[in-house]
Amino acid sequence: EGLAMLRAVLDDFRAWGGVRTTTTRDYRLTNASLSADKVVELSPQDHDEVLEKLAGQCTAALIIAPESDGILASLSALMVRNGARLLGSGPGSVATAADKWACHRLFTQAGLPTPDTCYADADGACKAAEKIGFPLVIKPVDGVSCEGISLIPDVPSLHSVLEKSRYVDRRFLLQRYIEGEHASACLLVAGNDNLCLSINRQFIEIDRPFSYQGSEVPFTGDKHQAAITLAQRAAALVPGLKGYIGVDLLIANEGCYGIEINPRLTTSYIGLRSVVNLNLAQAIWEASIQNILPRNVVLQGKFAFRKENLI
């Protein structure tokens, strides 16, 4: 997914022509073609040193990285510390959005619909589960895609999942399971304003663990406008968000629920760029650097993809 997003955004920057691009590439991906003006290989031994040098040489940086384990926030801070402007959210807002419990509290404090959720550890899991009720979903406090998320139908299943290393000696979320359509929103944020570009269907396999399989862009239905409104309200809750972000949603019979905020480029970018009437890389630059949002955005057609076919 990361490589597919990188290729897509580099192609869009080249099509725009407004900047020259330098990208890093994992040393294990030497055969991966990239449409950057310059490609710099990264290895674990020189990772930070190379990034610090590049940050000092560039005007701005767009980071494609997971927010789990503080990776995205740390890389964002590294870039800012070495003089680069971010084509995206600052490290503080990334850290807030990456914390699913912090997001849940922001949603509830703002009166946004979101599934009942408890913050728990292994010792308090059964008591928290009684409060939520089965079936429920267990998820790490931070994570990307469907990483570490499982559907728990009963107490024995909860005990089984808690024995896994991911949840040993760590806190996690237990969340009420709601039947519905898994969806996401793609947004641009500029200053205090934001614009929802699309609502997307997510193809999720509900299993132990959940598995993200792909997306369809755009996704429309009778709750389309409600989903847009919810996504825009959610995006406004975290100060400092900027550029492209995603908001995960659940569209149920009774309404829409906010799940979490993704303060970064999301995989749906790949589908969105194929149906939108603007250059998304240029739009990200203008939102992040100039605080300008595009006007007269139109989506034409649909684009569906499966994760295994991205590269």
For each predicted feature, which ranges?
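ATP-dependent carboxylate/phosphate-activation module, predominantly the ATP-grasp catalytic core
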Residues: 176-239, 251, 262-288, 299, ...
